[in-house]
Structures are given as C-alpha cells and as structure tokens.
A protein has these predicted regions:
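ATP-binding N-terminal substructure of ATP-dependent carboxylate-amine bond-forming enzymes
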Residues: 1-105
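Short glycine-enriched loops at secondary-structure junctions
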Residues: 37-40, 83-85, 110, 211-215, ...
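Active-site nucleotide/adenylate-binding loops and adjacent lid/helix of ATP-dependent enzymes
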Residues: 112-204, 212-215
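Glycine-rich phosphate/pyrophosphate-binding beta-alpha loops
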Residues: 165, 225-234, 276-290
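Phosphate-binding site of ATP-dependent enzymes
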Residues: 172-253, 264-265, 269-271
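Conserved metal-phosphate-binding beta-hairpin within the catalytic cores
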Residues: 251-288
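Peripheral (often C-terminal) accessory segments that flank ATP-dependent C-N-forming ligase machineries
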Residues: 295-347
Length: 347
C-alpha cells in the first residue's frame, strides 16, 4: 500500500496550477494537496484540502520562509504551478531538498533558462540539429526592418521572454513592424511557420515525460486552438507524424518530469516554436485522457516505481469559465485554510 503523499502546488490558482490539482485529484493516489499562492484572492486556496500563503519568490528572505513552510506542513513533493516560480525553485532545488526533505519537481537552471527565452530556444534547436523557425535579434528598429524586408511579410515580432502570447505579433508590413517594435520588450524576429486560426488546424501542444531513471514516456500529442494565450479547443489523438521529432527534442533536453513542446505541423514536417520544462496548462486534459503527468511524477520520484506505458485515449476537450462560490464572508476576512469554496453542478 502506498503511503500518503503531501504535495504543495505553487501558483495553484493559475491555469497550470489548477491543472496539477485536478490531475492529482483523479490520479487515485493517496495525495493531500496543499495549495499555495501569493495572495488570498485565488480560487485554489479555497478548493484544496489545505492552503497557505507564500511570499513572492523575489522577496527578501523568501527561500528561508518557503523552506520553513515546507517543514511546518510536512511537504513531500513540490510541484510548480506558476511559471514565475520556476527559475527560483530550479536554482534553489538542491538547497530546498536538503533543508526541507521535500522533492522539488523542476528542471535544471540551464534548461529553464533556455525554455524561458524564445531566442535561446531557437538557438538550442538549431545547435542540436532539430527543426526550428529561423530567428534574429535586431540591434534596433531599423535593423529589424531591414531583416523583415529581406525575409518578406508576414513575420513574427515577439518578446524573448513572455507568456500567454503577450507581446507576440504577426506583422504584415514594415509600417506595422516599426510601430510595434518600440512597444515590444526584448524584441526578436522569427520567420512565420503558419498563421494560427480559430479552428483546429496545424498547431499542436505536446509532451514527453522523463522519469527519475531518464526513461522517456510518451509522447502525448494534441491539436489545439488558442484563446488569450490558452489552449481552448483541444483534440487529443495519436498524431504519429509528431512522435519521432518530439522524442528527438526530448532526447536533447536535460530535464525531469514534463517537457512541453508547442509546434506547427507543416509540409516540411513538425517545427517547434516553444519549449516549456514544466507542467502545462492542459495538464488536466492530458490526465483525463490517460497521460497524467503529476501522477507519473509522484510514482517515479516519490514512490520510486517503474511507470507503465500509459494508454492514452482520443477525444476532444473544450474550455469554459466556472465560478468558485464562498458563502458568508467579506473581502477583509477571507482566510485561506479556513474558508472553503464550492462549485455548483449546474452546467
């Protein structure tokens, strides 16, 4: 019989954090979820078994406070639900584990740095002989215009660092490029692979899981549409044309747990444009269809079991909005860990 595992999820109210919690709930494993976030107005704090506020990772003394919380709450495993926390837990992983006894599911600092920087991602793919979309770092707007004119429009102007499609533009003319360039932090140019659409087309969200022993599980493949930077309609199927390139990418990356790959499938084959060495916003969808990465992380890193090959079913997921309702409380008195929210079965 497996022993109870206490899992702390950072950023538990974010899209990724919610996905981790949902996946743990359907895993069938003996798990107690301790939801954390930096502010009390966060839904996961009122839906998990336990909840606690943690400091921003960039705050002075955050490391000592977080280690103390892990000790106080007897945490066995830490899962990162906020991408803003990932660099911190990656850089401090060894110290956190040695001081608290908790296992931190986070890739190496170098891998996190590559995944966080879209320019470094393109460079990594190129250097490893993997498919990629050509990218360029302009010195200024005039230089950007010169390269864009040579490549031809449309092209992609985007920030090197960013999430949820913020500061990502498909630029159709030189005038548009020169207008948007000053508004784009850490700008880079990239050749356009394909134009995203509102229907299921050529864009995919995929994953390969790597166990504690370095064995690769998967890949998981799904086609998607995107709304507000989030996967909105998701078609899960065994898109076999993606399997070989995904395993090649995973084999080149130094990571543990989940590696998410966003890519386009073109006439030239699969071309990745983003890597994320963390759990995904579609974690719950993957778990439902049989590819439960938080469960695999616990089985491999905590329970130290050999993982079976998951049987992934096909299907479609559609996102929608939901409310968490907390009765008889005011803003100035709401307290994580004391108040509980409910979700009505009305839809």
């Amino acid at each position: 019989m497996r022993r109870q595992c206490r899992v702390l999820v950072t950023g538990a109210g974010s899209g990724v954090g919610q996905g981790i919690v949902k996946a743990l709930r359907v895993s069938g494993l003996p798990v107690t979820v301790v939801a954390t976030d930096i502010a009390p107005m966060n839904v996961a704090l009122y839906r998990a078994e336990e909840a606690v506020l943690i400091p921003r990772v960039e705050a002075s003394g955050a490391l000592d406070v977080i280690v103390r919380l892990l000790q106080q709450h007897k945490i066995d495993v830490v899962m990162i639900g906020s991408e803003f926390d990932l660099s911190f837990f990656s850089a401090n992983r060894q110290e956190i584990e040695s001081r608290s006894g908790a296992i931190v599911i986070a890739a190496s600092p170098r891998t996190v740095a590559i995944a966080d920087d879209k320019w470094l991602t393109a460079e990594f793919l190129c250097e490893n002989g993997l498919p990629y979309a050509e990218a360029y770092l302009p010195s200024d707007a005039a230089d950007a215009g010169r390269i864009a004119d040579a490549w031809g429009y449309p092209i992609v102007l985007k920030t090197r660092r960013g999430t949820s499609s913020r500061h990502v533009y498909i630029v159709k003319s030189r005038d548009e490029l020169l207008r948007l360039y000053p508004e784009t932090p850490m700008p880079m140019l990239q050749r356009l692979i394909d134009i995203p659409t509102s229907h299921l087309g050529s864009e995919y969200t995929c994953s390969v899981f790597k166990t504690a022993a370095g064995r690769m599980i998967g890949p998981f493949t799904a086609r998607r549409t995107v709304r507000g930077g989030t996967s909105w309609h998701i078609e899960v199927a065994a898109f076999e044309a993606l399997h070989a390139p995904l395993l090649a990418i995973a084999g080149a990356v130094d990571y543990i747990g989940s590696l998410n790959v966003q890519l386009m499938l073109t006439e030239q084959g699969a071309i990745p444009f983003e890597l994320n060495a963390r759990f995904s916003g579609t974690t719950a969808v993957r778990a439902h269809f049989g590819f439960n990465e938080p469960a695999m992380a616990l089985l491999s890193f905590f329970y130290k079991e050999e993982l079976p090959t998951p049987e992934v079913r096909s299907g479609i997921a559609m996102r929608y909005y939901e409310e968490v309702l907390i009765e008889d409380v005011r803003m100035d008195s709401i307290t994580p860990g004391q108040h509980k929210g409910k979700v009505n079965p009305w839809f």
